[in-house]
Amino acid sequence: MSATVRSAVVALASVLAALPAAADGWSPAPEPAVWVQTRQQLQASGAMTDRPWQFMEALETPELMAGEYLSGRTRTSAGVEFDAGLLLRRNGVEDWQVRELRMRALCNQQRLQRLAGDNQWVDYVGRDDTASKVAWICDIP
């Protein structure tokens, strides 16, 4: 795994671990205006893939701003595959970091995996609310 991918995974896991656990029946909140503007600017600049992104949640502290997005849910024999996007900016740094990862939800197992550089699926760091989020991800109309 490259250092860039490793640092993105660690950053995303840290952000997500800091977010409060969701209750059963979790669903994403509407995308706040500040995140709409940030995402649109990053898409327009080419830093983030220009496609429809579903806002999942965000963390805003004095040290860090991080937003989590999901796009392109597709049902597969293993569950649901999707693209995950992380927008990250640390205090004192003007530029945003954008990380996009291919992921999948293993619906029956209530867990997430990410596609590693060697095209192998590896378990994604879990949190208390992973099962609720997997249930939402797997609920494709």
Residue spans for each PLM region:
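Bacterial N-terminal signal peptides that target proteins for export
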Residues: 1-9
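N-terminal signal peptide c-region/cleavage motif recognized by signal peptidases
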Residues: 18-22
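N-terminal secretory-pathway/extracellular module detecting exported/lumenal segments
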Residues: 23-141
